[in-house]
Structures are given as C-alpha cells and as structure tokens.
Amino acid sequence: MHQVISATTNPAKIQAILQAFEEIFGEGSCHITPVAVESGVPEQPFGSEETRAGARNRVDNARRLHPQADFWVAIEAGIDDDATFSWVVIDNGVQRGEARSATLPLPAVILDRVRQGEALGPVMSQYTGIDEIGRKEGAIGVFTAGKLTRSSVYYQAVILALSPFHNAVYR
C-alpha cells in the first residue's frame, strides 16, 4: 500500500488525490495522510510561477515532515489571466510530476475584490453564502452550475501529474 502525504487538509483536494491514486494504482492501494504545511507564497497566489512555487514548496515541506512516505502531493490554487487554476506537484523521492489544471474565468465582480487583496475562497463564500466554499465545490462548482467541482478539476490534474509514475517512457 502506498503511503501518500497530502500537503493539504482541504477535503476537496484530498478527495481528488485519493480518487486519482486509486484510478491509477487500484482501489485501496494507498493511504492518504493529510498535513498542514506552509506554501511560502501569499494566501492568494497570482501568476503561474508563484502558484507552482507554492505547490513545490508544500511538497518539499511535507517531505521534510514525513520522509518515509512513498509519495508527497500538493495542490496549489492561484489566479492568472483573470482565471482560477491550480498546480499539482507529486514527488516520490526519485522523480516529480507536475500538471496545471483547467482554468475557470472569473467574473469582474469577484476579480476586483481578489485584486484588492482578498483571497478567492472568502470572496466566494460571501458571494454565495456557502461557508468555506473552498473546502467544498469552490468557484468551479458555482460557475459551472455543478457540472464540475473543485475536486473534479483537481482530479484530472492529479491524474496528469501521476503520468511519470506509471509510464516507463518517463524513466
């Protein structure tokens, strides 16, 4: 059984990690241990590079806390080009897989507040009345009318980031 350290305690992210690992390695093939670690970037990262750095930092910090795990996984959400997206970073001590998620364009009323220094999650919670929306369906669930959720979009990115770990051509 793979010991997987999730560099987050966010249920939406943990669900995506678990589903993706089970899809690739088989049901019941992994045990997820969530840990809260620092990203080293602002609460609301802007731009692809800052967001990717946050995910990389989280993986590195989780690895320092739990060096005996098989995998360390981080999902860092950010804002870039008027849209929200995330970077997924997965490390197994030998190689690293990284993937960027799909992007969701955000309406100006939301972006204006985020650009003024507020994080997307709290802004969306105020806009929708859904407490801790970032730990649930997220802006993605709201603006796609539930057709996608934060977790479902992250799931795809985790699957992509796992590609180097089960395809020999990457080695």
UniProtKB/Swiss-Prot annotation:
Class of this enzyme: hydrolase
Source domain of life: Bacteria
UniProt cofactor(s): Mg(2+); Mn(2+)
Residues that coordinate or bind substrate: 8-13
Disulfide bonds: none
Residues annotated as binding Mg(2+): 38, 68
GO process annotations (BP): nucleotide metabolic process; thiamine metabolic process
Any Pfam family hit: NTPase_I-T
Enzyme Commission number(s) of this protein: 3.6.1.73
Cofactor comment: Binds 1 divalent metal cation per subunit; can use either Mg(2+) or Mn(2+).
Manganese listed as a keyword: yes
GO MF entries: ITPase activity; metal ion binding; nucleotide binding; ribonucleoside triphosphate phosphatase activity
InterPro entries with a match to the protein in the record: ITPase-like_fam (IPR029001), Non_canon_purine_NTPase (IPR002786), NTPase/PRRC1 (IPR026533), YjjX_NTPase (IPR050299)
UniProt record similarity statement: Belongs to the YjjX NTPase family.
Function, as annotated: Phosphatase that hydrolyzes non-canonical purine nucleotides such as XTP and ITP to their respective diphosphate derivatives. Probably excludes non-canonical purines from DNA/RNA precursor pool, thus preventing their incorporation into DNA/RNA and avoiding chromosomal lesions.
Protein name: Inosine/xanthosine triphosphatase
Organism (species): Salmonella typhimurium (strain LT2 / SGSC1412 / ATCC 700720)
